[in-house]
Design a protein with these regions (language model features):
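Hinge/lid segment of periplasmic solute-binding proteins
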Residues: 46-54, 122-176, 200, 252, ...
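Short, well-ordered beta-strand elements
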Residues: 57-69, 90-95, 117-118, 215-217
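Extracytoplasmic/periplasmic substrate-recognition and gating elements
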Residues: 85, 91, 187, 266, ...
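Periplasmic solute-binding protein
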Residues: 124-134, 154-191, 219-242, 265, ...
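Mature extracytoplasmic/periplasmic domains
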Residues: 135-138, 305, 338-421
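Glycine-centered hinge/linker elements that transmit conformational signals in sensory
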Residues: 203-204, 245-277, 322
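C-terminal capping/gating helix-and-loop segments adjacent to ligand/active sites or protein-protein/ligand interfaces
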Residues: 334, 397-452, 456
Length: 457
């Protein structure tokens, strides 16, 4: 696994992955029409080794799974319905849910061979659950149905593991701040914080004018881990990981943890004990977020809509700016936020490839999906979404800001289950234990260091 990740990341970095997806508009041709090209031509390339034709007569059932909020659910379901109208012989069954617990359920399904035919996947799943190509099919084999020319080559390279294109990239994504300006204005502030000092000043104002229950920011364990990573990368200017080696010492991790603690101490954000006591599945499901007591979050640009869906109309929900914490670099990373893959257990991979192509590349599907999964990588899909007015301006603004700011590479081991799992992962253990005063900063730093090094080994 370690070698596969290192080789993949070397390819990604050389190609300049952080340049992002999209690009100039391209005329989309139906992927299925490309199958009409001669067999000789198709066998002379790395694309499909045989011509494929979508079955339009026999009854076929496909399954598809994804995670996300209500808006994403509605878009996927509408796109799948439109697909079945194009192919009346195909039925599409949908499975979806919130992120909490989703990866655990999907990893179990992959191991049991019961996963959906088409899966929305996190990028690191390709390495973690299919490091030898055992879980997902090689989409190069279906390039006469799924138009791979619509995707940037560097983004396809990022999804190539074990010499197999195991997913197509849906979007590039990074973390940024979103603010509820109604709460800021209630505190007498007319602008969101753009520097560390402005954030500290806002926290003081919130506490003085609104009370102890109001905070400019709320952050869970993973949010804190990513914020700390941005902070350390900005201060020291080093990538988080190089060649499967963590570039930060235990002492530097301790410094980062103490910085996170300073945000709690200065009323920037509540401690995790306070947040967990509410029993909310996510921050944005909780009353503290809905009522404006938590006035900011640090989340993926692709999550803009799901984060805002529970807010009242007068919340004045806006995307903020990235905050530069140090002088050595901007810090921070972007990644292939999610991909679409076909599982090895799928009995109808040609039709599954047609479903992915419909959702991402074809006019009707892409117009429905818009930016529900972030700013789409498909050139044709992005153009169709724009023509349909389905590009959410907030997501576009957030993604543009992220891509212009971040300057560090992303290592897929960062999201290994052993680190990221919400119940038993190292990040949750460290940040909850530290926030609950179960660990001091030195102990927490050592646990974090050891856990990361073990995941990288």
């Amino acid at each position: 696994m370690k070698k596969a990740i290192a080789l993949a990341m070397a390819s990604v970095m050389a190609a300049g992955l952080l340049a992002g997806c999209g690009g100039s508009a391209a005329n989309s041709t139906a992927a299925s029409s490309e199958a009409a090209s001669s067999e000789a031509a198709s066998t002379s390339t790395e694309a499909a080794t045989e011509a494929h034709t979508v079955n339009t007569t026999d009854p076929i059932t496909l399954t598809i799974s994804w995670w996300g909020g209500d808006a994403r659910q509605a878009a996927y379901e509408a796109a799948c319905k439109a697909f079945t109208e194009k192919y009346p012989n195909i039925t599409v069954e949908c499975t979806y849910g919130p992120w909490n617990g989703w990866e655990e359920a999907q990893s179990t399904a992959l191991a049991a061979g019961t996963a959906a035919d088409v899966m929305q996947v996190n990028w690191n799943w390709l390495f973690q659950y299919s490091g030898k190509g055992q879980s997902f099919v090689n989409l190069n084999d279906y390039s006469d149905v799924l138009d791979l020319t619509q995707f940037p080559s560097n983004a396809l390279d990022a999804c190539t593991v074990a010499d197999s294109l195991q997913a197509v990239p849906v979007a590039m994504s990074g973390r940024i701040y979103y603010w509820n300006m109604a709460t800021f204005k209630k505190a007498g502030l007319d602008h969101y914080p753009t520097t560390e000092q402005e954030l500290l000043d806002a926290a003081k104002t919130f506490q003085e004018k609104l009370g102890d229950d109001y905070y400019p920011l709320a952050a869970g364990p993973l949010d804190r881990m990513i914020m700390m990573t941005f902070y350390l990368e900005s201060k020291y200017g080093e990538p988080w990981v190089t060649d499967s080696t963590l570039n930060y010492t235990v002492e530097q991790l301790q410094e980062g943890l103490e910085w996170i603690q300073s945000l709690e101490d200065n009323h920037v954000m509540p401690d995790l004990k306070t947040m967990n006591a509410a029993g909310d599945k996510t921050i944005t499901d909780g009353q503290a977020w809905i009522t404006g007591k938590y006035a900011g979050i640090f989340t993926w640009d692709s999550s803009a809509l799901s984060a805002s869906q529970n807010l009242p109309d007068d919340a004045e929900y806006v995307v903020g700016d990235e905050i530069k914490w140090g002088e050595a670099a901007n810090g921070g990373f972007a990644k292939v936020s999610m991909g679409m893959a076909i599982t090895q257990s799928c009995e109808h991979p040609v039709e599954a490839a047609a479903l992915i192509n419909f959702i991402l590349n074809e006019k009707e599907g892409a117009s429905i999906m818009g930016t529900q999964c972030g700013m789409v990588c498909s050139k044709a899909g992005q153009e169709y979404a724009k023509e349909a007015g389905a590009v959410n301006e907030l997501i576009l603004e957030a993604n543009t800001k992220v891509m212009a700011f971040v300057d560090q590479p992303f290592d897929p081991c960062y999201e290994s289950t052993s680190l990221k799992d919400e119940t038993n992962g190292v990040y949750s253990d460290v940040f909850e234990g530290f926030s609950y005063d179960q660990y001091d900063s030195a102990e927490a730093a050592q646990i974090l260091y050891d856990g990361i090094c073990e995941a990288l080994a």
